UniProtKB/Swiss-Prot annotation:
UniProt key word Chloroplast: yes
Principal localisation: plastid
Name the record gives this protein: Uncharacterized protein ORF62
Organism: Porphyra purpurea (Red seaweed)
Compartment annotation: Plastid, Chloroplast
GO cellular component, one term: chloroplast
UniProt keyword terms in alphabetical order: Chloroplast, Plastid
Domain of life of the source: Eukaryota
Length: 62
């Protein structure tokens, strides 16, 4: 009976650590995706501001 409890405990440890590793890798992938999305939107907003500023200055000069 003692060996069976020890074996079950080892299985629980293996499942726990594999779940932790998988979750950690998933979080890293998710964070990198969020950073990529943030960078795309920041570039998009920056490009729109750069295109918007000359139009405003041209209208003020007229």
């Amino acid at each position: 009976m003692n060996n069976k409890i020890k074996l079950n405990f080892n299985y629980v440890l293996v499942i726990f650590f594999t779940t932790m590793v998988y979750t950690c890798k998933l979080n890293v992938h998710f964070k990198s995706e969020l950073l990529n999305i943030r960078e795309k939107y920041c570039n998009l907003i920056f490009d729109k501001k750069m295109a918007f500023i000359p139009m405003v200055s041209l209208k003020k000069n007229r």
